Amino acid sequence: MSAHDPARPRLLRPTVLFPLLLALLGALFVTQSGSSADAATGTLLRDGTGLYPRAVRLAHSGDANGRILASVVTFSGNDGLGAIHESTDGGASFREVGTVRDPDAAGGQGLCCSTLYELPQRIGDMPAGTLLWAASVGQDEPNRRMALRVFKSTDVGRSWSHLSTIATASNDKGLWEPEFSVDASGQLVAHYSDETDAAHSQKLVAARTADGVTWTGHHDTVASTLASDRPGMAVVRKMGDGTYFMSFEICAAAGQFQCVVHYRTSSDGWNWGVTTSLGIRPETADGKYFKHAPNLAWAPEAGNPKGRLFLVGQVLYNRDGSKAAGSGRTVWVNSAGGAGSWREIPAPVAVESTTVDYCPNYSSSLLPSADGNRLLEIATDWSGSVCKPYFATGSVPAA
């Protein structure tokens, strides 16, 4: 399952989500027998719905540096909310400290796929350490015109106010999965998935802002020559040598490599080369690959200017297309800027579910320690009919 299948149910309010899910399972998802109740290891981040987890370790927030903030999408009645959790003990425990309440996600209008970001430097009037939260809203409106809306917090996630809108759809198609980075020019960049172009089922787009308010330069970063291809779910990290690394999935016609994970690199975080280039498929030495909902992290590594990349995908496959034994229990590491083979390490949170949909191990959040030797993961899994987030931290084994 992909975040980019045109007919898939997005992260809707619970009153409509589960009936839709049940109706579409046969056509959209690959499901095998097996219990999914409380399948994930780790500790519950919250005892209730918590979708699309994201986590940041504060590094530009003065006395709050070292705290970990985590966000998930949740619901109260028909209102979509961003729940903000905080850890002051290195990820050993979390408590809820704030809520993002977007009126455009209230009353059943729809909320999906949020992100959380700490500004590493001043952007306009916003000092370094300002927190940003962004999400897709409006997918359930009768006259759908989705938007990517940004909120900010200047009090370590306790309160939030609307800042700007990255993009608003020109038609009833989708805008999904915003993620942030700061490019080499010092501007804030938003990366997102765009379904509004009639020439592409979906493509990846970037826009940027010098002040956090006015977004300009909207342009394609990955757009296949095949109209049916659906590149999406981009996440960008800047490596230690200044190179920018983008992970994403490409969903297309059914087959062994449907929704397989790819990557591209950029020298400045804004220009990504020929837009029709679909990038490189990362693999392990024995040919394993990830499919669906990738997520990415970077950390320094002693003696290595590039640092260390961490990559996770929803499902892990063997070279021959069979599901790998370590699927749902594996994270990858690479110390060569993505080049060459990737090394497998145990995932801190093990998700044993055999269901492939928008919950189990879907876009799991990875957060390395400051020295890169430990890794916090927040992953979701079904607990009965509720998609819940679980967290745990593990050591990163030496190569």
List each model region and its residues.
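Secretory targeting and sorting signals
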Residues: 2-37
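Asp-box/BNR beta-propeller loop motif
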Residues: 40-41, 85-98, 151-163, 208-217, ...
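Hydrophobic core segments of beta-strands in well-ordered, beta-rich domains
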Residues: 55-76, 115-118, 125-144, 149, ...
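Structural motif
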Residues: 78-84, 142-149, 198-205, 254-263, ...
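Blade-loop segments of beta-propeller domains
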Residues: 81-84, 90-138
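Loop/turn-rich, solvent-exposed surfaces of beta-rich toroidal or solenoidal domains
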Residues: 251, 258-261, 286-338
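Conserved blade-ending motifs and adjacent loop-strand segments that build the rim/top face
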Residues: 279-293, 341-369
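Blade-level signature of beta-propeller repeat domains, shared across WD40, Kelch, NHL, RCC1
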Residues: 364-399
